[in-house]
């Protein structure tokens, strides 16, 4: 019985620590890079990714936090 209560207490403490760490995580603001953390843009923003080319050769993917429902077109 004591082992069961101790296990439950440990699980509760671990889950509280995880929730607190997630709440303290700073969001990524508008027009900042989100390549490594695509789900971490601030509220009202989305992470949009583009494949970068140099002289026709793919050089990787770049992602940026941009406003939702906004579409950018090349000029």
Swiss-Prot record:
Keyword Signal: yes
Keywords, comma-separated and alphabetical: Disulfide bond, Secreted, Signal, Toxin
Annotated signal sequence range: 1-21
Main location: secreted
Keyword Iron-sulfur: no
A Gene Ontology molecular function term of the record: toxin activity
GO cellular component: extracellular region
InterPro entries: Spider_toxin_CSTX_knottin (IPR019553)
Propeptide residues according to the Swiss-Prot or TrEMBL record: 22-25
Pfam families (UniProt xref): Toxin_35
Modifications made to the protein after synthesis: Contains 4 disulfide bonds.
Subcellular location per the Swiss-Prot or TrEMBL entry: Secreted
Tissues where this protein is expressed: Expressed by the venom gland.
Family statement drawn from the similarity comment of this UniProt entry: Belongs to the neurotoxin 19 (CSTX) family. 06 (U6-Lctx) subfamily.
Listed name of the protein: U6-lycotoxin-Ls1e
Organism encoding this protein: Lycosa singoriensis
């Amino acid at each position: 019985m004591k082992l069961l209560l101790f296990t439950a207490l440990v699980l509760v403490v671990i889950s509280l620590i995880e929730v607190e760490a997630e709440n303290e995580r700073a969001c990524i603001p508008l027009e900042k890079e989100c390549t490594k953390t695509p789900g971490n843009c601030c509220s009202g923003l989305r992470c949009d990714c583009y494949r970068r080319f140099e002289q026709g050769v793919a050089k990787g993917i770049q992602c940026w936090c941009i406003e939702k429902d906004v579409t950018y077109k090349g000029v």
